[in-house]
Every structure is written in structure tokens, then in C-alpha cells.
Curated annotation (Swiss-Prot):
The gene is metE. The active site is at H694 (proton donor). Zn(2+) binds at H641, C643, E665, C726. The keyword Nucleotide-binding does not apply. Gene3D superfamilies: 3.20.20.210. Its EC number is 2.1.1.14. This is 5-methyltetrahydropteroyltriglutamate--homocysteine methyltransferase. Keywords: Amino-acid biosynthesis, Metal-binding, Methionine biosynthesis, Methyltransferase, Repeat, Transferase, Zinc. Pathway: Amino-acid biosynthesis; L-methionine biosynthesis via de novo pathway; L-methionine from L-homocysteine (MetE route): step 1/1. It comes from the Bacteria. Binds 1 zinc ion per subunit. It comes from Campylobacter jejuni subsp. jejuni serotype O:23/36 (strain 81-176).
Length: 754
């Protein structure tokens, strides 16, 4: 019995990669220094995985920004606008990631989307010229040879041709048709080069196979691989899937020329049933994904061994594997000195999951009952308390009307128009303002008890004053307090709710250099005291203009935390919804007229198969949001915000959230959502983000005016709000002020024309 992992976190034990790249962005280090830091990390990770006794060690899973972009660059799928900048390869790569504004030109970044049902974001490759598609990159070969120098025969990992093709945004059908042929030739050349290097195994990741596949999808997959697998020669190919099961294509895969199939037994609801129904091919190896790559709880060896025993009825050729990349979990529990051992023993981050794979291999390869098995089973005895009877009773007492807001949207809109007295095309921001070093230092000093609560509060109040003043000077219509007290929109609420646990160093990559530290939902959730009330009241006292109350919604708190596995996601979400509802009502009672409840991650846990959307998710996720705001008066305006997902196919459900205003990311996706909003007669007022805050470039007044005009061509002027596409926390003040001034100027200019 051997073991394997799909891929490993690349940010490093202490986010070394993030800091190395950011230094390069700030011109504080050279290209050579950045590449050396990256190589050092790769070597450290390979040695760590090797030391843990993993048999199939991945290479090419490392990335300076995003592995989808890496695959696109490998095959020269780079839009002409980036080629025309005439930058070197590294800076062209980062121009695609972040946009570019300088002496060589001014271009926006590639669109960013959620990676399937995770909180990782990938960059959408753009292809406007298929003629240039070819194997021009060498990253996959270089990194294989780096590992080889360490004495490691690695398994290069690459996004498969079918998934990559499905993720690319093509200019038109003609380009797409040519790209199909060119990309196939490029993959064939890749196979040839890997054969020249005498590579043993290549892992091709095809997560797109876990979606609902059409006949056309299956035909395309077969067309690609019937040709491609004829060119594998001595190279062994592992087809790796994750985030679901392969029900639409599994029987065909058994007949294919793949040497191994990687199946997910955590999220793949039908993976075991498919094997029980169709068996497994004698000429293939089963890479069994039984270590959860998306959650942090320790593996129960009894359950894993039971699964292996069942699988062995159908094949003896089994490799123990992770269910998906370990990118989605933190690096190691080694760095958690503050978390009580009664909790910590039940957690397994990436490094600990390597140990779990090693243990399981050893247990399966030994004849008598192994002490490793007994030690694992001991973990699950005497678990700390999780239940709160008051929370259970409150959930039980909920009635149908608790999930419905009255009066109707139409009636509320008239009442709010009279009450709020906002101009046409009201301008606002999404919530957070830049967090400078002194803001972070103040928060850290307070956490470490180096300053008093009074000093901490006074510092933040001064920052709020400055933030309100800046917004008033710019001329925004609806203000925010800036969120200087918050480290992260989910972690902050978790810290102030009962039922959550926190790590010191549990960082996970969200995109590029952005890392998040998800809280852990351990027990029943409740609010013991107001969370944002004092900050919102203080901010509102500073201005005659409306200052929004800012909250994070229950679905996002759930989706951006590591969830419990002992109760349903529905129950966890409703517990959080009741806690946030209490906060909403406190804000309203304090005179806060607009309350924003962000649901940035609404789409994240939406099942990948449409047949499961409602029964497994939307039927409880949308009502949970309704529960949060259903108790407010008609005159109180409820906003929500969503970002970096595809919403076109769930807009009716989003409308059913019954918010009064929704803002969403639209700038990177070229406002393509607006046509759908128009088509379904979306009732909610909308703020399609008019510029991309994830890029350092400052949009001009002309550019913003054109964007606003585009929006006005699609939607009624009474329905539109003008705002950036996301919070401004990660940007510098000079970029923010310049961009917002241009936003207000452009809006005023357009108002004069209406």
C-alpha cells in the first residue's frame, strides 16, 4: 500500500511566499531574490513531504500567484493586451494577475473566479489569438528537475486539457475551435518532453468532470484524451478528480487508457457506489481520496480503514490519497501554542495530514493491530463540550414568519426613498478602508494586552474620524466607518461570538498574496454582547450623512470558517443567523438607517451539480439570510454584498434574499451580469462594482463614466448605486482617494446629463 498527496500549500509555514512577492511588488527586492525565495520554499516542502514518508510527491503544484494562470502561461495562452506591454516573463505574469499601469501601458487584470466550491480564487485565462498557443513555458520541467536534484522522483501535477479548455474565456467561436486543436498539440508535446526526461507519473487534474456533464462535454473529453493518451508512451497518467464524484463518465473511464484514477471519497457522494456498481479496472490504480483536504479535523482511522476494506473487494491496486489539494487547509498545528490541547489534538492541518497518510499506510501494511490505530481512536474520547441548550431551544421556537420580511419590497422602496432622501445614483463604498501598519500594530498591541482598552478604542475612533472626513471631502453620499477594529470580516465576528475557536497561524491562501485565517466553528453559536454597535454609533455621531452599519452574513461566516462535522451546515448557519439578527436589531434601535449584511461567499458551498442546488443548499441558505433581517422596520434599508463568483444562474434566489440593495463584483467580468439582471427583471436595487479594487491601478473619470453609462443602458437609473467592487482594506490611501474622487466626479457628470 502506497500513499500520495494531490498538492501542498505553497505559502510557507509563516506566509514566506506572500511577503517575498509583496516585497517584489513594492520594488524592495529583485526578481532574482523573489525566485530564490520561491525555490527555497519548494525545496523545504519537498523535503518535508519526503520525510513524512509520502510515496507520490507532487511537483509543479507550487505557484507565484495561481496554478490556472501557470497552466495558461505554460501553453502561451496570454491575451494580446499583456503581450503588447513588452514586459519580461515575470512582470507579464503579474500584469495578468494584478493589472498594469505604467510607462508600458495601462491594462486591467484577468477576471477572478471562485475555484469550484472553495474559497480559493483562480484567474480566468483569456484567449484572443489561438495561433500562438504552444508549449512555450518550462516551469513544469524545471520544477521536476529541481526535485530530481534532491533525489526525489516527483509526480508533476498539471490542470488537465479538458478542465483548462473549459475555464478559458475565448474571444469567439472561431478562436475556440482553433484553440482546441492547438492546445491538444501542445499537450502532446508536453507528453513527449516528459518522456524525454524519463518522468514516471504525470497527474492531470480534471475537477470539471464532477459537474453535470452534457453529451457535448463528454464527447469533448473523449476527443481530447483518445488522441492524447495515444502519445503517452512510457509516461503513466493519473486522472485526478476532486470536489465531487464522476457519475456522468465513470464507466467510460474504466475503458480508457489512463493508468490510474483519483477519486474523491469525501465530497464524492457516489464515488463508492460507482465502484460497487461498475467495479474497478484491473489495469488501473485507484488513488483513493480519503483524507479530507478541505477541513481541519483529524481523520478517524476506523472510518478510513472500513472504506479501504470495502474498496479492496474491487481492487488491490490502491494508493491512499488526499481528497483534494492541501492548499485549502493551514500549514501545520506546530505553530499553535495558545489553543488548548483538548482541541488541538483533534485538528490535522496539511503537515499533520501527511502523518495521517503515513500512519494509515503503516497500519494497512502491518498484520497485527497497530498502536497507531489505538492512539488515533483515543483522540475521539472525552471531546470538549459543544452543545448549548438555550441555542437549541431558540432554534426550535422559530416560526415561518421569522423568515419573511414585511411589507413587500415595492412598499419598502417608497418608504425608504422618503426616509433616506438619497440622490439619484447614490455613491458609497463596500465597507473597509485601508489598514495601515499602525492600525494593525494597534490591534496586535491590544490583543497582546500591551495597551489598554481605552487606548485601543481612542486610536480607532481617531481613525474613524479621519475616514469619515475623507469620505465627506470626496463627496460620497453614504459613508462607512472603515472597519479599523476588524482583522478579517469573518474572524472578527467569530471572535465575538460564543462557539468559535481561533488559530494563531492557520493561514490559508485565498488568491495570490491574500491569505485568510478561517475561524473554527466548534460548538453551538450565540451572541453574548453587542459586537459592532459602539463603533457604528460613534461613526454616525460624526456626520449628518448616513453611515452604514456593517455586518457579515451567516452563510459567509459559515463558508469562510472550518465547519462542524457533527451537525448539519443548515443548523450551524441558522445558529449564526440568530446571533447576527440580534446585532441587526440593536443597530436599528440605535438609529442606524442602512445596515449592510455581507454575503460575499454565498455561492461557495453551492453544490457543483444543479440537481442538488436547492435541496442541499439554497433551501436553507436563503432563508438563513432572511432570518437575519426579517425583524427590521420598513424604513431601514438592508444592503448586501457579494464578490468573485458567478451569480447569473442563481439571481432569482438572490432576489429572494429580499435585501433592498445588493452590490457585487462586476468590473473584472465586464459587467456581463447586467444582461441577466435585466432579463429576469431583478427587483433589488444594485451597485455593480464600477472598478476593480484588487488592482493597484487608478481608473480615470472617463473610464468610470463609460462604465456608469454602460450600466444605465442596461438598468433603470432609479435602481442603480455607484460603488467600487469590493472593500478597500488591501489598497493604499493614495490609490483609494484618487479612485473615489474620480468615481464621484464621474457620477456627478452623469447625473447632470440625466
Amino acid at each position: 500500500m502506497k500513499n500520495s498527496i494531490i498538492s501542498y500549500p505553497r505559502i510557507g509555514a509563516n506566509r514566506e511566499l506572500k511577503f517575498a512577492i509583496e516585497k517584489y511588488f513594492k520594488n524592495q527586492s529583485s526578481k532574482e531574490e523573489l525566485l530564490k525565495s520561491a525555490k527555497d520554499l519548494r525545496i523545504r516542502h519537498w523535503q518535508e513531504i519526503q520525510k513524512a514518508g509520502i510515496d507520490f510527491i507532487p511537483s509543479n503544484d507550487f505557484s507565484l500567484y495561481d496554478n490556472v494562470l501557470d497552466a495558461a502561461v505554460l501553453f502561451n495562452i496570454v491575451h494580446t493586451k499583456y503581450k503588447n506591454l513588452n514586459l519580461d516573463a515575470l512582470d507579464e505574469y503579474f500584469a495578468q494577475s494584478r493589472g498594469y499601469q505604467g510607462e508600458n501601458g495601462d491594462v486591467t487584470a484577468l477576471a477572478m473566479k471562485k475555484w469550484f466550491n472553495t474559497n480559493y480564487h483562480y484567474l480566468v485565462p483569456e484567449c484572443d489569438n489561438a495561433d500562438i498557443i504552444a508549449l512555450t513555458g518550462d516551469k513544469i520541467f524545471k520544477e521536476y528537475l529541481e526535485a530530481k536534484e534532491l533525489g526525489i522522483e516527483s509526480k508533476p501535477v498539471l490542470i488537465g486539457i479538458f478542465t483548462l479548455f473549459k475555464l478559458i474565456a475565448f474571444k469567439d467561436e472561431k478562436t475556440q475551435k482553433l484553440a482546441k486543436e492547438k492546445l491538444l498539440n501542445a499537450y502532446i508535446e508536453l507528453f513527449d518532453k516528459l518522456n524525454e526526461l524519463k518522468v514516471t507519473w504525470l497527474e492531470l487534474d480534471e475537477p470539471y468532470l464532477v459537474y453535470d456533464l452534457s453529451k457535448e462535454d463528454i464527447a469533448l473529453f473523449e476527443e481530447f484524451y483518445q488522441e492524447l493518451l495515444n502519445h503517452k508512451k512510457d509516461l503513466k497518467i493519473l486522472l485526478q478528480s476532486y470536489f465531487g464524484d464522476l457519475r456522468d463518465i465513470y464507466p467510460k473511464l474504466l475503458e480508457s487508457k489512463f493508468d490510474a484514477l483519483g477519486l474523491d471519497f469525501i465530497e464524492g457522494k457516489q464515488s463508492l457506489a460507482l465502484i460497487q456498481k461498475y467495479g474497478f479496472a484491473k489495469d488501473k490504480i485507484l488513488f483513493a481520496g480519503l483524507i479530507n483536504g478541505k477541513n481541519i479535523y483529524a481523520n478517524d482511522y476506523a472510518k478510513s480503514l472500513k472504506l479501504i476494506k470495502e474498496l479492496q473487494k474491487y481492487t488491490q491496486n490502491i494508493v491512499l490519497n488526499t481528497s483534494c489539494s492541501l492548499l485549502h487547509v493551514p500549514y501545520s498545528t506546530e505553530f499553535e501554542s495558545k489553543l488548548d490541547s483538548s482541541y488541538l489534538k483533534l485538528f490535522a492541518f496539511a503537515k499533520e495530514k501527511l502523518q495521517e497518510l503515513k500512519d494509515l499506510k503503516e497500519i494497512l501494511n502491518s498484520s497485527e493491530e497497530n498502536p497507531l490505530f489505538r492512539a488515533n481512536q483515543e483522540l475521539f474520547k472525552n471531546i470538549p463540550e459543544r452543545l448549548d441548550e438555550k441555542v437549541k431551544a431558540r432554534l426550535k421556537a422559530l416560526k415561518k414568519e421569522d423568515f419573511t420580511r414585511t411589507p413587500s419590497f415595492k412598499e419598502r422602496a417608497l418608504i425608504q426613498k422618503e426616509f433616506l432622501k438619497l440622490p439619484l445614483l447614490p455613491t458609497t463604498t463596500i465597507g473597509s478602508f485601508p489598514q495601515s501598519t499602525d492600525v494593525r500594530s494597534n490591534r496586535l498591541a491590544f490583543k497582546q494586552e500591551k495597551i489598554s482598552a481605552q487606548n485601543y478604542t481612542e486610536f480607532n475612533q481617531q481613525k474613524i474620524k479621519e475616514c469619515i472626513q475623507i469620505q465627506e471631502e470626496i463627496g460620497l453620499d453614504v459613508l462607512v466607518h472603515g472597519e479599523f477594529e476588524r482583522n478579517d470580516m469573518v474572524e472578527y465576528f467569530g471572535e465575538n461570538l460564543k462557539g468559535f475557536l481561533f488559530t494563531q497561524n492557520g493561514w490559508v491562501q485565498s488568491y495570490g498574496t491574500r491569505c485568510v485565517k478561517p475561524p473554527v466553528i466548534w460548538g453551538d453559536v450565540s451572541r453574548t454582547k453587542p459586537i459592532t454597535l459602539a463603533w457604528s454609533k460613534f461613526a454616525q455621531s460624526l456626520s449628518q450623512k448616513i453611515v452604514k452599519g456593517m455586518l457579515t452574513g451567516p452563510v459567509t461566516i459559515l463558508n469562510w470558517s472550518f465547519p462542524r462535522e457533527d451537525i448539519s451546515l443548515k443548523e450551524s448557519t441558522e445558529q449564526i443567523a440568530l446571533a447576527i439578527r440580534d446585532e441587526v436589531l440593536d443597530l436599528e434601535n440605535a438609529g442606524i438607517k442602512i445596515i449592510q449584511i455581507d454575503e460575499a461567499a454565498l455561492r461557495e458551498k453551492l453544490p457543483l451539480r444543479k440537481s442538488d442546488w436547492h435541496s442541499e443548499y439554497l433551501d436553507w441558505a436563503i432563508p438563513a439570510f432572511n432570518l437575519v433581517h426579517s425583524g427590521v422596520k420598513a424604513k431601514t434599508q438592508i444592503h448586501t454584498h457579494m464578490c468573485y463568483s458567478e451569480f447569473g444562474d442563481i439571481l432569482k434566489e438572490i432576489d429572494a434574499m429580499d435585501a433592498d440593495v445588493i452590490s457585487f463584483e462586476a468590473s473584472r467580468s465586464n459587467l456581463s451580469l447586467l444582461d441577466t439582471l435585466k432579463a429576469i427583471r431583478f427587483k433589488t436595487e444594485v451597485g455593480p462594482g464600477v472598478y476593480d479594487i484588487h488592482s493597484p491601478r487608478v481608473p480615470s473619470v472617463e473610464e468610470l463614466s463609460l462604465t456608469i453609462e454602460k450600466i444605465l443602458n442596461k438598468l433603470p437609473k432609479e435602481q442603480i448605486w455607484i460603488n467600487p467592487d469590493c472593500g478597500l482594506k488591501t489598497r493604499a490611501y493614495e490609490e483609494v482617494i484618487a479612485s473615489l474622487k474620480n468615481l464621484v466626479t464621474a457620477t456627478q457628470k452623469i447625473r447632470e446629463q440625466l
